[in-house]
Amino acid sequence: VTFDFSQENRMTVHQNVAEPWRVTLVDTGLNTQTGGRVKRVQKYIGSEPFMLTYGDGVSNVDLNALLNQHRSSGKTVTLTGIQPGGRFGVLDLEGQTVTGFREKAKEDGGWINGGFMVMNPEVFDYLSPEERCILERTPLEALAQEGKLGIYKHPGFWQCMDTQRDKNRLESLWNGGNAPWKVGEV
């Protein structure tokens, strides 16, 4: 699909084969934080659970498993938790002597928000359309305190793309035919 907003606000469909998805692109404001952005799209959502992603993470999250867990949990929001590997290796030490090197283990107990979420429309009650509303602060913290925030623990591949280094790593995986997130033919 090509969207051409330069003159005629035209959409061109290049192939007739498509998933049964509804995609809405909304300008929520250049300086609007994450919570304000979600609140500003409320009128497009409807009454069903919806999926949200930040768009700067690449993963092989099983979206069906995420959705099924969300539905069975009764939570308002279910986020995908991941355990990122350490960026730096760990030194094994005995006193002032290095005795070995190893990668930082994922299993150090720390989980982070991987950025793939399922939300019930009830989440809008926790959000403000103001530019400064940050989803990860007051809204998600309130849901957590109320026991309404769930986690889907994703054991598979996840990589953020925040830096040129991240971009280069992901491109290297793709170009080498080792992209765990690739589904189907491209």
Predicted regions and their residues:
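A generic structural signal for alpha->beta connector loops
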Residues: P20-R22, G74, E146-K148
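Short beta-strand-to-loop element that shapes/binds the nucleotide-sugar donor at the catalytic cleft/hinge
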Residues: V77-G95
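Short, high-confidence coil segments that cap the C-terminus of an alpha-helix
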Residues: S47, G74-K75
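Conserved N-terminal catalytic core of the sugar/cofactor nucleotidyltransferase
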Residues: V1-Y54, A65, T163
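Residue-level detector of conserved, well-ordered beta-strand and adjacent loop positions
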Residues: V26, E94, R102
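Catalytic-core segments of class I nucleotidyltransferases/pyrophosphorylases
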Residues: P49-M51, V58-R71, Q83-G86, T97-V186
